[in-house]
C-alpha cells in the first residue's frame, strides 16, 4: 500500500501541477468543461498531497505520530476526493 500511494502521489502531484499551469497560464477562454477539469485537477492535487502522510503511517505499522487535527485533515482530504 505505501508503494502504490507513493507512486500515485508523485505522478498525481506532477501531472496535476502541469494541468493547473495549463489551465491558469495557457488557456484564454473557459467554458463549463474547462471549469470542471480545473476543479478536478485541484481536487486531485489535494488528494495527492495527503498521500505522503498516509505512506508514512502505513510504513510505520499503523502508527500516527502527528496531531489529531492533522489526522482528521488527512482523512478528510483522502475520503472527500475519492
Curated annotation (Swiss-Prot):
Residues in compartment: Cytoplasmic: 26-35
Q: Which UniProt keywords apply?
A: Cell membrane, G-protein coupled receptor, Membrane, Receptor, Transducer, Transmembrane, Transmembrane helix
- Provide Extracellular-side residue ranges: 57-75
Query: What is one Pfam family matched by this protein?
Result: 7tm_1
- The transmembrane segments are 1-25, 36-56, 76-82
Location in the cell: Cell membrane
**Gene Ontology cellular component terms for the protein in this record:** plasma membrane
User: What SUPFAM superfamilies would the database entry show?
Assistant: Family A G protein-coupled receptor-like (SSF81321)
Record membrane topology: Multi-pass membrane protein
Task: State one molecular function term (GO).
Answer: G protein-coupled UTP receptor activity
Main localization, broad class: membrane
Q: Which domain of life is it from?
A: Eukaryota
Q: Which family does it belong to?
A: Belongs to the G-protein coupled receptor 1 family.
Q: Give the protein's biological function.
A: Receptor for ATP and UTP coupled to G-proteins that activate a phosphatidylinositol-calcium second messenger system. Not activated by UDP.
Report what the protein is called: P2Y purinoceptor 2
Q: Which gene underlies this protein?
A: P2RY2
